[in-house]
Amino acid sequence: MANSKLEKSLGLIRKKIDLIDDQMLSLLEDRVSLVIDAENLKKNTSKGPFYRPDREKEIVMRLQSLNNSPLEDNKIRTIFQDIISACFSTAFEI
């Protein structure tokens, strides 16, 4: 009986995690699309440089200041640096 209740609880938690993962993927798709738009705008107006480390640092610091989760700031930095890098490299390849 207890095992069945545990499985049901785990199943509900996993469904919620899956929904969050779906939302995160959708937001990543939106983000990369906007980065592509920004890079195209820069290319068309010669407003370089395309990569701005100061902007990346600003984004990461802002997100770290908003962090209220158990995730440590260095993990927030790593996650978002990876996201920023993936979006930028995708935009640059197009």
Task: Tell where the protein language model's regions lie, with residue ranges.
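Domain-level signature for soluble enzymes in the chorismate/prephenate branch of the shikimate pathway
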Residues: 1-94
